């Protein structure tokens, strides 16, 4: 099955770099849970497509991608990854980070270990593969997980009474003063080119 990102390390490095930029310590197990959530929610949003070519297994600690785990076992690996991932995927990962990036390890364990995909694979034995279809079904049903719309919906700003408001980027506009009442306008009008003027 085709994946939309070249390798799972691209996504792992994205999370690691984002955590570093925000002075957030990213535990190796937390990285594993974020990768699992990223793959599962992406499959829901894109009709079963993979975000990254990754295989998750049901470890006793929680869902884990063994290649990423081995790669990060002694710190950040020195490998070449894509410097820039596609804009749509960057936006998706940003939404996911906003929702789960600052969550505690306990909360992420509760969410991921509570999915039927993890439970079914774990019941078959340690380190059993968690299929993408099982992950997608778990996240579609939103069992012990936030619904996909809660994860990727755009942020809505509200007033203190709870009414939604539309927020636009602020653009500084230079206002021209009321010409009839402006001292500056009168001053400029009274000066002619080349003559000395004193402000009243």
Regions found by a protein language model. Name each.
Residues 1-200:
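Domain-edge interaction signal
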């Amino acid at each position: 099955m085709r994946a939309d990102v070249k390798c799972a390390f691209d996504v792992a490095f994205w999370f690691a770099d984002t955590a570093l930029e925000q002075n957030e310590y990213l535990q190796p197990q937390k990285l594993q849970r974020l990768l699992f959530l990223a793959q599962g929610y992406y499959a829901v949003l894109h009709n079963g497509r993979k975000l990254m070519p990754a295989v998750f297994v049901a470890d006793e600690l929680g869902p884990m991608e063994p290649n990423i785990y081995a790669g990060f076992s002694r710190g950040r690996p020195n490998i070449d990854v894509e410097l820039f991932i596609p804009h749509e995927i960057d936006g998706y990962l940003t939404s996911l980070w906003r929702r789960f990036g600052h969550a505690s390890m306990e909360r992420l364990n509760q969410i991921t270990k509570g999915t039927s995909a993890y439970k079914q694979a774990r019941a078959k034995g340690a380190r059993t593969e968690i299929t993408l279809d099982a992950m997608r079904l778990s996240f579609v049903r939103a069992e012990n997980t936030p619904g996909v719309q809660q994860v990727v919906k755009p942020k809505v700003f509200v007033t203190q009474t709870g009414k939604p408001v539309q927020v636009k980027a602020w653009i500084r506009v230079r206002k021209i003063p009321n010409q009839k009442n402006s001292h500056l306008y009168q001053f400029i009008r009274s000066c002619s080119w080349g003559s000395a003027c004193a402000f009243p």
